[in-house]
Design a protein with these regions (language model features):
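Helix-to-beta-strand junctions that scaffold the AdoMet/dcAdoMet cofactor pocket
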Residues: 257-258
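Acidic carboxylate diad motif detector
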Residues: 266-267
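Glycine-rich beta-strand-centered segment in the early N-terminal region that forms part
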Residues: 20-34, 48-95, 136-139
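NAD(P)H dinucleotide-binding glycine-rich loop of Rossmann-like/cofactor-binding domains
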Residues: 91-174
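N-terminal glycine-rich cofactor-binding segment
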Residues: 5-21, 38-69, 84-85, 102-113
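Mid-domain Rossmann-like dinucleotide-binding core that forms the NAD(H)/NADP(H) cofactor-binding site
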Residues: 79, 140-221, 226
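C-terminal substrate-binding/catalytic core of Rossmann-like NAD(P)-dependent dehydrogenases/reductases
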Residues: 226, 271-315
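Glycine-centered, small-residue-biased loops immediately flanking beta-strands
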Residues: 169, 261-262
Length: 315
């Protein structure tokens, strides 16, 4: 089979490699679609801790396909079944795993990160992934290219679940990249009264406007605070999602939030510059809640898959 194989920083080769052999409890999936995200780019550039020097591996952790081969003990996943493969597995017995947060397990594994992934014609699904419920059936009506977005969309779902958004609330999304667009679309589907998107990159701002996802503001050309106050009856944003790895965005969120507002620092900062300066009195006197989420659990992937299948959010 053909596969894109990582050999080192900026060295990704399309090679003819053997089709994986499966063992007891494992599955072989024929890949229909595998999407690329920022994690894959960090891997490619040699900036991922799970790809140390000397690693030779097939990346790709956002994978959709059909069951090509299943062991005799895998009656729940017959040959031909279309599935999304949730990438993250935990140890299965730590506190994080048993409370549904296997993405936070200290001993996690992930397809395409710690084992060969989906940038290939076939991918082997480890027995642990099958046992922990990571193989999610998808309907025939769902485009494989859309289903492959289940994992990043699950990260978005996890982020918004932490914010406990209520219908009618004003939502500000800072950053209109793919993740920011997903956040804006999901917020609308969940009943946000107003969605405002802040984006300085012209192409991304134009795309957000074409998608009609809300009021799009270029903070370099407009006063974001003034626009937000106009759209919120001078209250500020009930929900702020910082979907950009920017220090200024995190710092300004506290000022832009309404009283009792909730903020999610969704985009991580560069590891060599991880600190920000904040006015803690704004947190105290406005009773703000600041949270963050990272990656997604298997449960988040199931919920994201159900939302995609429902058609409520067009990805």
């Amino acid at each position: 089979m053909l596969a894109a194989v990582y050999h080192g920083p900026n060295d990704l080769r399309v090679e003819d490699v053997p089709v994986p052999r499966i063992g007891e409890g494992e599955l072989l999936v024929k890949v229909h679609s595998a999407s690329i995200c920022g994690t894959d780019l960090r891997i490619l550039h040699g900036n991922h801790r799970m790809y140390p020097s000397g690693t030779v591996r097939i990346p790709g952790h956002e994978v959709v396909g059909s069951i090509a081969e299943a062991g005799a003990d895998q009656k729940a996943h017959p040959a031909g079944q279309r599935v999304f493969c949730a990438p993250n597995t935990g140890c299965g017995h730590c506190l994080q795993c048993i409370t549904g947060n296997n993405n936070l397990c200290a001993n996690y594994d992930a397809i395409g990160v710690t084992s060969d992934g989906g940038f290939a014609e076939y991918v082997r699904i480890p027995a642990k992934s099958v046992q922990q419920g990571n193989i999610i059936p998808i309907g025939d009506a769902v485009d494989p290219a859309v289903a492959a977005l289940t994992e990043p969309f699950a990260c978005v779902v996890r982020g918004q679940n932490a914010l406990r958004m209520q219908p009618g609330e004003v939502v500000l999304v800072i950053g209109a990249g793919p993740i920011g667009i997903m956040h804006a679309k999901l917020a609308k589907a969940r009943g946000a009264g107003q969605v405002i998107v802040s984006e300085m990159i012209p192409d991304r701002a134009d795309q957000a406007r074409r998608l009609g996802i809300g009021r799009v503001v270029d903070p370099a050309a407009e006063d974001l605070k003034q626009v937000l106050w106009q759209e919120s009856n001078s209250r500020g944003a009930d929900i702020i999602i910082v979907a950009a790895p920017a220090h200024a965005a995190q710092e300004s969120a506290l000022e832009l939030a309404a009283i009792s507002g909730r903020i999610n620092f969704f985009g991580g900062l560069p590891k060599d510059r991880p600190t920000v300066t904040i006015d803690s009195n704004l947190i105290h006197y406005k009773e703000l809640v600041i949270t963050a989420t990272t990656a997604c659990s298997t449960a988040d992937c199931w919920q994201a898959s159900q939302i995609i299948a429902s058609g409520l959010v067009d990805l």
